[in-house]
């Protein structure tokens, strides 16, 4: 943990030290011509000291998990002033490009401390990292097992569909062949029945047994031949019940407890009415009883 922490803290510390030394040297070189070098040194150390003090306080707050925008703003202000001093000095020198190349060091140091602070707020202990890795690995394992299971189920379903389709095709072929054979047999029977000598031959055979029967021969009938029952006589004369009459009958069946029982008893009594009318009458009667 400490080793990983130093990976972000060490660059920030090194950049801060270089920028502070550079700032002091530039201030002494720049202001030493107009004032004693001791005064210029004090000015440079004061600028660096203020920046270092705000940085130390900001790091103290970060260690407690706190944050102060005012302190952060003051720290960026010191960094901006130091950068401004370096830029102003570079513009007055003959080799301005070389000085401008290092004028960004104070702001870079401040940015590195910002990155280090962000890393600290998101840093985790090795135990937590191990747990996260275990959770991720477990999720990957479950996803792989689910994908394999889906692929296996898909393969099984494809095999089943192919088997069902093949069986259906075989059944269809057998049915087609059977239908063709039946059609051929019926055609042969029909030709035999319609033949000129068929009726004569059957008449000769059956005349001794049933002399009065007509000489006819019909194809056998396949399936049940129950006669359709005749319609009830006088059903057209039945007068349908009115809503009031249905309500009167259903009011006597309220004690049945449910509509199905009441409807069954209604029909057992010999009455007839549509399902919709019975349901509407039941609702009306039950509302009246409830009221």
From Swiss-Prot:
Transmembrane portions of the chain: 24-44, 71-91, 99-119
Alphabetical keyword list: Cell membrane, Membrane, Plasmid, Transmembrane, Transmembrane helix
Membrane topology, as annotated: Multi-pass membrane protein
Subcellular location: Cell membrane
GO CC terms, sorted: plasma membrane
Function summary: Involved in plasmid transfer.
Protein name: Protein SpdB
Species name: Streptomyces lividans
Gene behind the chain: spdB
